[in-house]
Structure formats: C-alpha cells, structure tokens
Amino acid sequence: VTSYSEIRKDAESISRWNMNHPNENPQISFLERTISNNEIPVVAVSDYIKMVPNQISSYIKNPFYVLGTDGFGRSDTREGLRKFFEIDRYYIVLNSLKALVDRGNLQKSVIKKAMDKYNIDSEKPDPINS
C-alpha cells in the first residue's frame, strides 16, 4: 500500500456515493475490488503507528491483522526500527502464519518452526512496554 489514507478516502467516497444514490447500482471501492475473498486473512503493516493501517479496517471484511510501530524505538535505521517493533519480514511471516492458524488452515506447530527458523525469541520484551 502506498497510502492508507488515500485508500480510506476512496472507500469513504464510494460509501458516501452509494448512500446518496440508493436507486443506482452501487460502486465498488478499490479495497473491495482487490480484496474480495472474505476467507483470506489480511496483514496490514506500517512503519507508523497501528492506527495508520487500522483506518481501513472497517472497509475490509476479511480477518484483519495490523502491525505498526506504537511506542518509541531505539533504532538508528529503518531495518532496526522494524526489528525492534516486530514488523520486519520475519514478523510479517509469523503474523501471516498465525492468521492462518487462527482460521484453522495450519497447525500451531508451523508457528514454532517459523520462530526457530527466523530466531524469534518468544520471551523478547514487548516493544510497546519497553
């Protein structure tokens, strides 16, 4: 996503148009056109606070998971920031697997295997509280 706020504006605009034109065929937002399968979990990630990707949550019917950088980081690089706040590629994979486990598509053991493979410490302090 290049701009969560632009996607939200599109969805809000379409929603408003549909409300104001009840006798016409409803328009479909970009989100509805691109994420139309209600079975597939969506993992939305941002280098900003979770509220940034969360602003589109009401327009997504799919199971929705959000990763963001809530709190204060101790990072001098973007890569360090993503690792500290658990939003790097490894945590995106981990959250995607968790979403599939939650839906019953995978066994829980897959999560542990991924954590081992990517050296994810289950006892790492929560970045929001550290």
Regions found by a protein language model. Name each.
Residues 1-130:
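Thiamine diphosphate
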